[in-house]
Curated annotation (Swiss-Prot):
Its EC number is 4.2.1.68. This is L-fuconate dehydratase. Plays a role in the catabolism of L-fucose. Catalyzes the dehydration of L-fuconate to 2-keto-3-deoxy-L-fuconate by the abstraction of the 2-proton to generate an enediolate intermediate that is stabilized by the magnesium ion. L-fuconate is the preferred substrate with 15-fold lower activity observed for L-galactonate and 8-fold lower activity with D-arabinonate. No activity detected with D-fuconate. Can also catalyze the epimerization of L-talonate and D-ribonate, but at slow rates. Gene3D superfamilies: Enolase-like C-terminal domain, Enolase-like, N-terminal domain. Mg(2+) binds at D248, E274, E301. Substrate binds at G22, S23, D24, Y32, K218, N250, E274, E301, H351, A352, G353, E382. Binds 1 Mg(2+) ion per subunit. The active site is at K220 (proton donor/acceptor), H351. GO terms for molecular function: hydro-lyase activity; L-fuconate dehydratase activity; magnesium ion binding. It comes from Xanthomonas campestris pv. campestris (strain ATCC 33913 / DSM 3586 / NCPPB 528 / LMG 568 / P 25).
Length: 441
């Protein structure tokens, strides 16, 4: 019998703030980081499962400690039993009678639980010798719904409704898989649009994005309206009228200012405004959507669980949503969110602006195409061109599209050398960086 013998964690941080990669109106100096987890087993060929929580620097130690605190809940479990019932494994963590007090199902502990759940899915896909998107897409509708906790959802999506959606898609799975492998999945890029970039860098990267085949770019906005008008004008001139341009305020505004600000940017034919206000403010998003029609409104990367997504959809507060592979309770909760979006007919544009997020969320979007909606040409996965070299199975982008992963698992495994180099504070990079700072002082 194979057994989980250890839960291993690493606080991994990359100095992205040095070049202002990832900078936006609320987060001007992010150091992209990961609370990285490995589920070690005594299975053959060093079988293991990998997962992570994305953070932006300070606090990553807190997030890593939360992941480590889950060791007693998973070490000693049978690998085969975990794989056979990933729904029960997830509920073992999310429904713990004492851990729930730290949420319930939100915040640092919920993200930690999500990382461990994702590592279990990675383990299952590796054991099946399949990339995760294919592993999910080849589960039966009954197996898929068994992974989902429908508590708090039944007023919007029942188990029977979810089964009907999945069963309706089942006859097309083989054809959709072939299409995905042949064509890839559409991507959009945020790489030109970080707020700290110079105008020259913005224009250069926007033109490069179009040349690389991207049909949508996204700019960060929200710090200064005149700067945003200038940057949007430069970007629109660089990409031309036929390329879509979205903007992202990263929760910077109250409701009234969001409406006023977006009315001033409307001339640039905005594809959507992302995170205009607090991710918890369902009614605020609804008011903004009403106030800036026809500009679409989006949120989701900080939406903390399936319940808030349900409310956003029920309230008609959004035109599209972002899912995030590492924000909610793992694959299980993201499957619930994808099915909710399908029920309400709302498009999903997954969030991937962070270390490892492109690698992870591509699997969820592709599984959605094959097993749930059959749609991808009216949506896209975010792409940022940072830090992929640190992963054993990095994303592959060709002509503005994600190519379907072929390597078994969730694409979450990092190179051991990268972990050794960038572990905080004892990795070689950070030791040398601290020494250099002391020398300058």
């Amino acid at each position: 019998m194979r057994t989980i013998i250890a839960l291993e964690t690493h606080d991994v941080r990359f100095p992205t703030s040095r070049e202002l990669d990832g900078s936006d109106a609320m987060n001007p100096d992010p150091d992209y980081s990961a609370a990285y987890v490995v589920l070690r087993t005594d299975g053959a060929e060093d079988l293991a499962g990998y997962g992570l929580v994305f953070t932006i620097g300070r606090g990553n130690d807190v997030q890593t400690a939360a992941v480590a605190a889950l060791a007693e809940h998973v070490v000693g479990l049978s690998v085969d039993k975990v794989i056979a019932d990933l729904g029960a494994f997830a509920r073992r963590l999310t429904n713990d009678s004492q851990l729930r007090w730290l949420g319930p199902e939100k915040g640092v502990m919920h993200m930690a639980i999500g990382a461990v759940i994702n590592a279990a899915w990675d383990l299952a896909a590796r054991a099946a010798n399949k990339p995760l998107w294919r592993f999910i897409a080849e589960l039966t509708p009954e197996q898929l719904v068994d992974t989902i906790d429908f508590r708090y959802l039944s007023d919007a999506l029942t188990r029977d409704e979810a089964l009907a959606i999945l069963r309706d898609a089942q006859p097309q799975r083989a054809a959709r898989t072939a299409t995905l492998i042949e064509q890839g999945y559409p991507a959009y890029t945020t790489s030109p649009g970080w707020l700290g970039y110079s105008d020259e860098k913005l224009v250069r990267l926007a033109k490069e994005a179009v040349a690389d085949g991207f049909r949508t770019i996204k700019l960060k906005v929200g710090a200064n309206v005149q700067d945003d008008i200038r940057r949007c004008r430069l970007a629109r001139a660089a990409i031309g009228p036929d390329i879509a341009m979205a903007v992202d305020a990263n929760q910077r505004w109250d409701v009234g200012p969001a409406i006023d600000w977006m009315r001033q940017l409307a001339e640039f034919d905005i594809a959507w405004i992302e995170e205009p206000t607090s991710p918890d403010d369902v009614l605020g998003h609804a008011a903004i959507r009403q106030g800036i029609t026809p500009v679409p409104v989006s949120t989701g990367e900080h939406t903390q669980n399936r319940v808030v997504f349900k409310q956003l959809l029920q309230a008609g507060a959004v035109d599209l949503i972002q899912i995030d592979a590492a924000r909610v309770g793992g694959v299980n909760e993201n499957l619930a969110i994808l099915l909710l979006a399908a029920k309400f007919g709302v498009r999903v544009f997954p969030h991937a602006g962070g270390v490892g997020l492109c690698e992870l969320v591509q699997h969820l979007a592709m599984a959605d195409f094959v097993a749930i909606t059959g749609k991808m040409e009216d949506r896209a996965i975010e792409f940022v061109d940072h830090l992929h070299q640190h992963f054993l199975d990095p994303v592959r982008i060709q002509h503005g599209r994600y190519l379907a992963p072929e390597v078994p698992g969730f694409s979450a495994e990092m190179h051991p050398a990268s972990i050794a180099e960038f572990s905080y504070p004892d990795g070689r990079f950070w030791v040398e960086d601290l020494a250099a700072s002391k020398a300058k002082a």
